[in-house]
Every structure is written in C-alpha cells, then in structure tokens.
C-alpha cells in the first residue's frame, strides 16, 4: 500500500526550506484543510488551484507529484 501524497510530501519538510518543494511541504503541513488522504492528481490539483495561495506556481506541485509517482505509485 502506498502513502497518500500529503504523507509523502511531509518527508520534504525543513525548518528553513532549501527549495520550493520544501516550502510547499511546510505550507501543506500548516494547511488544516489540505486533503491529507488524497492520492489522485485531479483532486489535489483542483484543491491547490482553487483553495490555496501559498504555491508560487502549479509547477511546484507538478514536480512534487512526479516524484510521488516515481517513488510511491511506481508509474
């Protein structure tokens, strides 16, 4: 069984983020409405596009999603 995207993303959290994915992980951690159990691209991208303002660009999510697919979903 694979981790949800949120739980996968948490491995990138850093007190002082070194990159955009670490900053994204920190913001997602602080976002109490983040869909923590979601593992579908459409659900997550819709939430991020419509409900948050902490991502500088959706390309940050796309990069994190590609890593998630490779590591967890083995696509």
Name these PLM-found stretches.
Residues 1-24:
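N-terminal acidic leader/helix
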Residues 1-2, 35-39:
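Short acidic alpha-helix initiation/capping motifs at coil-to-helix transition points
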Residues 12-13, 28-32, 47-51, 64-68:
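Generic structural signal for hydrophobic core residues of well-folded globular domains
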Residues 14-18, 34, 54:
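Alpha-helix boundary/capping and short turn/kink residues
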Residues 20-37:
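A short, compositionally biased N-terminal segment around positions ~18-40 that is enriched
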Residues 37-66:
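Short, charged early-sequence alpha-helical segments and their helix-coil boundaries
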Residues 71-75:
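Short acidic DE-rich linear segments
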């Amino acid at each position: 069984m694979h981790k949800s995207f949120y739980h996968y993303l948490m491995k990138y959290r850093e007190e002082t983020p070194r990159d955009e994915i670490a900053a994204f992980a920190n913001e997602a951690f602080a976002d109490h409405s983040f869909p923590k159990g979601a593992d579908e691209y459409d659900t997550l991208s819709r939430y991020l596009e419509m409900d948050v303002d902490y991502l500088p660009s959706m390309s940050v999510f796309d990069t994190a999603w590609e890593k998630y697919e490779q590591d967890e979903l083995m696509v």
